[in-house]
């Protein structure tokens, strides 16, 4: 009888353990966890399968964040950092074809008219939904000219040396609490490189949407315009109104070489509950 109960007890523990693993994985998948810990930072790096140097950069940024005070410039902010979700996995796979975007996500952007006039007015368009970019596309003519217009995560994987040349060079992670926060949990954003003496006739555009309550969005945008080149980049940001706060803390680094021209336009239409 004791052997039976021992076996039954072990079986129950196994079932409970298996259930907890499923719950844990689903929590990360849905992104419902709140609060920032080193485990959260490392989990983001794991999900993105990043190189070691980026993982260590995130950890340094996290340490600076938890040991620093809010900046002494601007209005006093009453942010509850424990009530923010710092990362949410993509709800639609990254694609360069709008028809392949998840219908739920597509409906949100279609209502805003983000993609409707892409071919008519823009040389390239990107769209980010919460933590991840879900759509990125550029006309083939610019690809032939070696222009790079990618989401930042893809640029890190595809052009690691070019990425490292510009990343964290203008805006250091230890400038203030919010640059450190971005360094720890950055996700998504736009990476643009325009080679020498290349002129883009129409703008590139990216659109950033916070669509979940208590969500933090931390995109990282890098724009490098080489000698004698010209580009106009337009960035749009918005979020619906919820009864709880959200947080947007992005970093933008722009490099403009000799005789180059760069026009950067940002249109931010945040709801009143977004810090």
List the predicted regions and their residue ranges:
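Charge-dense, intrinsically disordered terminal/linker segments
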Residues: 1-3, 65
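Short, positively charged and aromatic/hydrophobic N-terminal segments
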Residues: 3, 9-10, 18-26
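Polar helix-capping/helix-linker motif
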Residues: 6-7, 159
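Glycine-rich and polybasic anion-binding loops at the starts of cofactor/ligand-binding domains
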Residues: 22-275
């Amino acid at each position: 009888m004791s052997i039976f109960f021992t076996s039954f007890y072990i079986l129950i523990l196994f079932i409970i353990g298996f259930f907890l693993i499923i719950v844990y994985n689903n929590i990360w998948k849905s992104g419902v966890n709140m609060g920032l810990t080193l485990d959260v930072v490392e989990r983001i790096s794991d999900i993105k399968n990043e190189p070691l140097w980026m993982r260590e950069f995130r950890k340094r940024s996290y340490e600076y964040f938890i040991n620093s005070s809010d900046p002494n410039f601007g209005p006093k902010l009453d942010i509850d950092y424990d009530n923010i979700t710092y990362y949410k996995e993509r709800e639609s796979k990254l694609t360069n074809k709008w028809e392949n975007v998840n219908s739920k996500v597509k409906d949100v952007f279609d209502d805003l008219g983000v993609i409707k006039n892409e071919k008519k007015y823009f040389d390239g368009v990107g769209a980010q939904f919460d933590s991840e970019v879900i759509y990125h596309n550029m006309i083939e003519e610019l690809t032939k000219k070696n222009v790079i217009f990618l989401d930042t995560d893809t640029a890190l994987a595809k052009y690691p040396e070019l990425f490292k040349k510009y990343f964290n060079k203008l805006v250091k992670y230890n400038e203030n609490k919010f640059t450190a926060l971005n360094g720890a949990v950055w996700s998504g954003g736009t990476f643009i490189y325009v080679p020498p003496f290349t002129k883009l006739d129409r703008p590139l555009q990216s659109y950033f949407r916070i669509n979940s309550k208590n969500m933090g969005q931390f995109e990282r945008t890098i724009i490098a315009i080489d000698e004698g080149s010209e580009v106009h980049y337009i960035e749009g940001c918005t979020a619906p109104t919820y009864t709880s706060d959200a947080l947007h803390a992005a970093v933008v680094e722009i490099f403009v070489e000799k005789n180059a021209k760069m026009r950067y336009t940002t249109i931010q239409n945040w709801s009143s509950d977004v810090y």
